[in-house]
């Protein structure tokens, strides 16, 4: 038993070293605005329902890591859709810096064309096929994986491909809605390094403590109260503990 465990640990260590050699160093196409986005006194409700939030205001600084948390149904994903312009606030407005470029990861994995291969889904003219396959390697797609039809991928594989795709957009503001939902802890840790090192602003909805710690969150927005505070692990853990039944 001991020998088997030692062999497994040795294999994992070797694999981690292999992954670390191909981590990405992709940068945004341009530096973002000093203030990429301001949410100004917004209220939002779906038709004939109570407002999800009233008079919510905040602004985000360039390269900030901003975390949104709350129980199910309080409007976390809705707030992201308001920021993206997919929904309009009932009152108030959202302002964008003139250098703000946005890329969005949806937990529904809607970014992917299921009729294309893995490689075709991330095809960018600025990269050669060899470069693209190296990039795919940093998201744990190897060799013939590049030619798999996206429709046959598992949810975890689709999530990895979607995360790869949004990084290749080279936007200076990444909006991530539960990016680790389909990932096992080891995969999340490896892929999370690509976001930890990204030289842009990140707004993320997540309850994955390991991922949150990994990408160095600066501030925390708690819904539905709208309370904003500087991030600490203790504050997040206290909030998560308060939501347990």
Placement of each model-derived feature along the sequence:
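Flexible nucleotide-interacting loop at or near the entrance of a catalytic core
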Residues: 1-52
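ABC ATP-binding cassette signature C-motif
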Residues: 31-245
């Amino acid at each position: 038993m001991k020998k088997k465990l030692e062999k497994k640990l040795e294999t994992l260590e070797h694999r981690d070293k292999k992954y670390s050699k191909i981590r990405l160093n992709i940068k945004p196409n341009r530096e973002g605005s000093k203030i990429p986005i301001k949410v100004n006194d917004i209220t939002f409700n779906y038709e004939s329902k109570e407002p999800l939030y009233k008079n919510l205001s905040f602004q985000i600084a360039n390269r900030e890591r901003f975390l949104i948390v709350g129980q199910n149904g309080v409007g976390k994903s809705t707030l992201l859709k308001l920021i993206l312009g997919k929904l309009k606030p009932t009152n108030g407005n959202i302002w964008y810096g003139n250098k703000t470029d946005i890329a969005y990861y949806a937990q529904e994995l809607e970014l992917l064309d299921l009729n294309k291969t893995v490689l075709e889904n991330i095809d960018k003219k600025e990269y050669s096929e060899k470069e693209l396959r190296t990039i795919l390697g940093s998201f744990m797609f190897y060799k013939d994986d590049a030619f798999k039809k996206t429709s046959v991928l598992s949810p975890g594989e689709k999530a990895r491909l979607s995360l790869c795709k949004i990084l290749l957009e080279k936007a200076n503001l990444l909006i991530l809605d539960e990016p680790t939902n389909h990932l096992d802890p080891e995969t999340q840790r490896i892929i999370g390094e690509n976001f930890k090192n990204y030289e842009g602003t990140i707004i993320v909805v997540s309850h994955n403590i390991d991922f949150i710690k990994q990408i160095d969150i600066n501030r925390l927005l708690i819904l539905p109260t709208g309370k904003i505070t500087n991030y600490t692990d203790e504050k997040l853990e206290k909030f998560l503990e308060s939501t347990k039944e």
